[in-house]
A protein has these predicted regions:
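Active-site-proximal loop and beta-strand segments within enzyme catalytic domains
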Residues: 21-134, 142
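A short, well-structured edge-of-sheet supersecondary motif
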Residues: 1-25, 57
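Short, well-structured active-site flanking segments
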Residues: 13, 29, 41, 47-66, ...
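Penicillin-binding protein/beta-lactamase superfamily catalytic region
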Residues: 176-307
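Short, contiguous, pocket-lining structural segments
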Residues: 128-135, 149-154, 258-262
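Short glycine/serine- and small hydrophobic-enriched flexible loop segments
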Residues: 47-54, 138-146, 269-276
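Secretory-pathway/luminal and periplasmic proteins that interact with or process carbohydrate-rich
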Residues: 13-15, 68-76, 87-93, 165-175, ...
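Short beta-strand/turn segments that mark the catalytic/cofactor-handling region
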Residues: 310-312
Length: 312
């Protein structure tokens, strides 16, 4: 199953969907896990606080969350977190999936775990940037709900101030009606990627890298991961494969960094607003000043010694 939606200068110009497996329940408004696209929504949420004068990117997290200072995290600022430089790419304790439900987030079940977690940095200062694949969203959520005057979770903010006003299907934490519209994820697996990499590009190869390039990149990633996280646990209890994201309890919880659900139409609509400077038509997601600060002064660094990145 796949969807594609493209806006050009604020106008929707492409709106496609299809089901290669002839799924009768799949359509343009089906919801799909968009994984790390949710990280952009985290950035919008934090930028909204900055735009309202409730936070700055230089604010240390413990200023708004005093208990966070445990384990030597007292100097970590909001910008460090957003740049994947908080030293919390993994946790020592696997999270219970029910702790991700909004009511349990507000009861500080997840927050208390983060408060007691020591940061893990690699030795070289130049390689402090490590991909917080799932954990960044959890920490951002804790910061956001403490600063937001209404005490909302990120999913609640998104529904009330972004997705709702735009009528855009982008959700963090699904309800009963939304669960009925979800299309399961089906991983292709490394074998499919490897087989596809053998096809020459002139014959329509569907993956970017050829076999040898793919193997070189995979080897570097695997060796780096083993060096950094050889003893790390799964981020969530009983999570043994990517299929765990199809679990209903997981879908109901808030993991913004890796478990946001959207239609292509919804995600593209929000992207169009951001491409227009934070406002499109009568709906403003961010003030222009907040939008400018969000994109100011990108900092280059290697992500885990593998991938060159530039984050503001």
């Amino acid at each position: 199953n796949a969807q594609l939606c493209v806006y050009h200068r604020g106008i929707k110009v492409v709106d496609l969907w299809c089901s290669k497996i002839h799924d009768p329940n799949f359509g343009a408004d089906s919801l799909i896990n968009v994984f790390s696209s949710g990280k952009s929504l985290e950035a919008i949420a934090i930028a909204s606080l900055v735009g309202r004068g409730l936070l700055t990117y230089e604010t240390t997290i413990c200023e708004v969350w005093p208990e966070y200072r445990g384990g030597g995290k007292e100097h970590t600022c909001v910008a460090d977190l957003m740049r994947h430089e908080a030293g919390l790419a993994t946790f020592d304790t696997a999270i219970a999936v029910d702790d991700l439900l909004p009511e349990n987030i507000k009861a500080n079940r997840l927050g208390s775990l983060i408060e007691n977690q020591d940061p893990h940095f690699r030795s070289a200062a130049a390689t402090r940037r490590e991909y917080h694949a799932m954990t960044r969203g959890w920490i951002v959520n804790e910061v956001f709900r403490r600063v937001d005057p209404a005490g909302r979770t990120l999913g609640e903010y998104l529904a009330e101030e972004i997705s709702g006003p735009l009528n855009a299907d982008v959700v963090v934490g699904l309800n009963d009606a939304q669960l009925r519209r979800v299309s399961d994820i089906t991983p292709l697996g490394i074998r499919c990627h490897i087989l596809a990499s053998f096809r020459p590009k002139i014959f329509g190869r569907k993956v970017l890298h050829n076999f040898f390039q793919l193997m070189a990149r995979l080897l570097k990633v695997v060796l780096t991961a083993r060096k950094n996280f050889s003893a790390s646990k799964p981020p969530i209890q009983n999570m043994r494969s990517i299929n765990f994201f199809n679990d209903e309890r997981m879908r109901r919880g808030e993991t913004p960094s890796a478990n946001t659900h959207a239609s292509a139409r919804g995600l593209a609509h929000i992207a169009a607003v951001m491409a227009a400077g934070g406002q499109l038509g009568s709906v403003e997601c961010l003030s222009r000043s907040a939008w400018d600060l969000l994109h100011k002064d990108p900092q280059p660094a290697s992500m885990g010694g593998v991938l060159p990145t530039r984050f503001t």
